[in-house]
Design a protein with these regions (language model features):
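Hydrophobic residues in alpha-helical membrane-spanning segments
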Residues: 7, 136, 151-153, 163
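Short leucine-rich amphipathic alpha-helices used at interfaces
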Residues: 19, 101-102, 117, 123, ...
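Hydrophobic transmembrane alpha-helices of multi-pass small-molecule transporters
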Residues: 73-74, 143, 150, 159
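Juxtamembrane boundary at the C-terminal end of a transmembrane helix
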Residues: 82, 156-165
């Protein structure tokens, strides 16, 4: 973990370097693609959650929450593309709908995989949180577990399908 975490987070720096003019936008996508599905899954799970996703690893996660996380991520990725295109660049630059769709759909799954992976590590170590730096949220690693998986994924997608062609 000592090597994997910094290498994975380095993807945020690498994704920023893919496009000199829009690197900050790319880096923000890394974070949003990880945190939006988490929030969407939380609210969808609270409202509609009936079927447990991985009860042994993370008992509160539901299939309905995962679906809500995917839907919310797709919507927010497209909204970010629209904000970038229409508000930041006044319609002169267009974000790739396809690239953001792929990041929205599969980024939510990768984000959930990251969250579940770190939950499994915590369960095997018999700890609830990786720290108590952020009240109610545990440690910094608890907030960035999904980013650690999502950032390399966004880098891969943005390398193959540029977010801003």
């Amino acid at each position: 973990m000592v090597v994997i975490i910094p290498l994975a987070l380095q993807s945020i720096v690498l994704v920023r370097g893919l496009n000199a003019d829009h690197g900050i936008f790319y880096a923000l996508i890394c974070v949003f693609a990880a945190w939006v599905p988490d929030a969407g899954a939380f609210f969808a799970g609270k409202l509609f959650g009936k079927h447990k996703l991985c009860p042994i690893i993370s008992p509160k996660k539901t299939v309905e929450g995962l679906i809500g996380g995917i839907i919310s991520n797709v919507i927010v990725m497209q909204l970010l593309g629209w904000v970038f295109s229409e508000i930041v660049y006044d319609g002169t630059r267009q974000a790739s709908v396809l690239s953001l769709l792929v990041i929205g759909l599969f980024g939510a799954l990768v984000s959930t995989l990251g969250d579940l992976s770190f939950s499994l590590i915590k369960r095997s170590c018999k700890i609830k949180d990786f720290g108590n730096v952020i009240p109610g949220h545990g440690g910094v690693l608890d907030r960035f577990d999904s980013v650690i998986f999502t950032a390399p994924f966004v880098y891969l997608v943005a390398s193959l399908l540029p977010i801003v062609p």
